[in-house]
Amino acid sequence: YEMLRSLVGSEMCIRDSSNGVDTKYFSAASDTELNPKFISGWLDKENNAVSDYLVFAKSVLRIPEAHEMIARYTVLDEEAKRLILLRPYQIHAIEAIRDASKTGKSGFVWHTTGSGKTLTSYKATRNLLMDIPAIDKAIFLIDRKDLDTQTTMAFQAYANNDLIDVDETDNVFDLKKKLKSDDRQVIVTTIQKLQRLITRKLQEGTPEYHKIKNLKIAFVVDECHRAVTPGTKREIERFFGNSLWYGFTGTPRFAENPYPQMGDLPRTTQELYGDCLHKYTIQNAIHDNAVLGFQVEHNGPKNKKDETDSNLYVTESHMLKVLEVILNKSYYKLGFQNGKGKTYEGLLTTSSIQLAQKYYDLLKMVKEGKTTLKIDEKIKQVLPDFPKFAITYSVTENEEGSHVNQQKMQESLDDYNKMC
C-alpha cells in the first residue's frame, strides 16, 4: 500500500512514502522539481537501512523528532532556491556532536568525500551556537584561502533564512574585530589568520587580549586530518583555554598512517581530536548510491595476502611494474583501438603526496627514455607523444613538508605550461 504524510512547519513540507516494505522521505516539491537523488531512505546510527515504516515513524515522525527534523535538519538554500533535507548520516553526526558538546567533549566525524560535509559542518556549527548558550563564538576553520571564500558563500546561502549570522574574515584585523564583538556568530576563517592573530597581533596584558583569550569557542575544522597540525592545534588550545574541537575528515590519520613523530605531539586523528563521533565511509556511500561506485580489478596472484611490508610498494621496481600495466597493457581500456582523438584519459591516485611526486618523476624518466620501461610501438603509432600527464594535490602552508610540496608543485606547473 502507499502511505503519504505531510508535516507542515511554517512554509516547509516534508513527505514520506512507503509501500510497507521500503520507506523514503523527501522535501515537498512539484513533480517537475522532484529529483530522485534527493529522496532518502532512513539509516540508523550504524548506517543500517531502516525500511520498516513503523520504525521509521518512531525515529522521524514522532514528536519531538518531527519538529527537530524541520527546525534543525532542513536548510533553505538561498542560491539554489530549494529546501534541503539532511540525510540520515548527516543528522546522526550533528546529534553526536551535540551530545558530546553537552559533556564538554571534543571529537571528529569521519564522513567520506562527496557525502555533503560542507552542509553537515554548517549545521553542526550553527547548532553548537544555538544549543549551547555558554559558547560565545563558533569558528569554522579551513586551511586554504580559496576555500575561505567558497565555504563562506555556501554557509551564507544556507544561513540567509536562518537565525544566525555567518561572517567571513577579510584579514587578521577583521578576525580580531569579530572576536572582540559581543555578537554571537559563526565565523569562517583560515587557520593561518587565526594563528597569526594569537602569535603576532595581540599584545599580552591588554583588555582586548584578555577578552579574546577568555572566549568560549567551539571550533569546527574542515579536512581536519591536514588543516591543523598537532603543533598548531596545541598552540591554539593553550591560548583559547575554553574551547571545544570538532573535526571533519574523509581520511582520518590512524596508527597505520600517523603524523610524523614530533616530540610528545599526537600522531592520530583520535589522539588529536578525541573519539570518532560518527562515521560514514566510502563503503557506506557506494552502498547507498551517494557517490559514484568503482569497477574493481585485482592485478596479481589469486588467493595471496597483500605484502605486509608496505615499503615494497614504493620501490622503483614495483612502481615501474604498475606503470607497465597502465601504459602498455591497457590498450583497449584506454580506447587506443578507436584511433587518435578518441582515446580515454585516466587518473592515478596514490596513498600520499610524496608517492604521487615519485610517480610523476618516474613518468618523466619513462618519457625521456631513462628507464627499462619503453612505450609499446603499437601505442606510439596512435599517440606519438604518449603519455601526457600532470599532477595535482592540495598545497597547504601549515603542514610539515609544505615547502617541499610547494616547490615540487611549481616545477610540475612549469612542465604543464611547456606542454601546453
Predicted region positions:
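ATP-dependent helicase/translocase motor core
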Residues: 1, 6-138, 146, 150-161, ...
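Switch/connector loops and helix/strand junctions flanking conserved nucleotide-binding motifs
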Residues: 22-35, 148-151, 195-199, 228-229, ...
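Signature of the SF2 helicase/ATPase Hel1-core->accessory helical subdomain module
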Residues: 27-29, 191-309, 319
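Conserved RecA-like ASCE P-loop NTPase motor core of nucleic-acid helicases/translocases
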Residues: 110, 136-144, 343-352
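Flexible phosphate/Mg2+-sensing switch loops adjacent to catalytic phosphate-binding sites
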Residues: 132-136, 163-167, 257-276, 367-387
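Conserved helix-turn-beta segment of the N-terminal RecA-like "Helicase ATP-binding" lobe
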Residues: 146-171, 365-373
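Inter-Walker segment of RecA-like/P-loop motor cores
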Residues: 157-200
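Conserved C-terminal RecA-like helicase domain
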Residues: 310-420
